[in-house]
């Protein structure tokens, strides 16, 4: 007697979920949006994952039609509710717009709340850029060396007082600041955006009007030390401020 073939709805669901994740990963890779979610050093792992899912999808597609013994009715041994979390993740990923961490979360996460000195003595901090920065006529803060320069300014401010500096970040108004002060901030991502921490530096300007919370600026000025919350902190006395669009890669990543 010929075997009866029936649709296996569990296999169909698994195939749809795998296809959804493949499309999502390829889309994130092709549009270069992975850095909105993870550190670029992990991008290759997700690219490999996308290719690994393809043969898994092929294997599932081969099981969509299954032979059933004549005396047995087809039935599923698993609960289809177990697929719900994967379906929800896919729906949210495709339905919700990409969201970049902004100034609204800085107060919650704490500006400069976890610096190198929080876990080691200042004299133990690695200073790979110290000589270069001291000799440079202008300190240019780039995405690549952002965290190292911020650590230098945070813990060795005296080495750089009155040096000229230029950097880009978004505006955050810190509690306890004066009407002429704001912080210029970037989010530092170690692994993924869930562990992102805001790092920045205080800035002083003649007139803060027009510099809205979360606005991206490129600033130039001279490094100084100012009192803030009963301690001396690094600050930039601004000489030039330029409004800029949000960068395509808004986060910075510490060196490996």
Map each language-model feature to its residues.
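Beta-strand/loop nucleic-acid-binding surfaces
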Residues: 196-209
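Short aromatic-glycine-enriched beta-strand elements
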Residues: 178-189, 232-235
